[in-house]
Amino acid sequence: MYPAHLLVLLTVCVSLLEASSIPARPLNLYQFGNMIQCANHGRRPTLAYADYGCYCGAGGSGTPVDELDRCCKAHDDCYGEAGKKGCYPTLTLYSWQCIEKTPTCNSKTGCERSVCDCDATAAKCFAKAPYNKKNYNIDTEKRCQ
């Protein structure tokens, strides 16, 4: 399939999604995942962070279980602050580069910059924090009160 055809198909799909009652999927998760891979040099799959501790993944409550979980809570809080400014963090696309294994935001202003900064800071934090396998897929009802 030609790139132009893919662009048209993507445009139609996004238009249909916006017109439907189906809630939109987070569009920037792909970018955030790539930032994580940039920062951790591909040492750990992005999905390893999707269900970690009390804050990595959807939602979050209680006390973070470790340093990595604190990174996720800080990321959630950063998205919350961006939301207070009228941004939609999970839907905001931004410009960034991986420079010497460091996520670097190119977006200069507004929601794009705010959300990019949230994601870049979290990706760098993830790369520095130890990953404890026993905190993956924990029972959040018991451990995150």
From Swiss-Prot:
Signal peptide range in chain numbering: 1-19
Transmembrane segments: none
Free-text comment on the cofactor: Binds 1 Ca(2+) ion.
Tissues with expression: Expressed by the venom gland.
Prosequence residues removed at maturation: 20-27
Bridged cysteine pairs (disulfide): 38-98, 54-144, 56-72, 71-125, 78-118, 87-111, 105-116
Protein name: Basic phospholipase A2 notechis 11'2
Provenance organism: Notechis scutatus scutatus
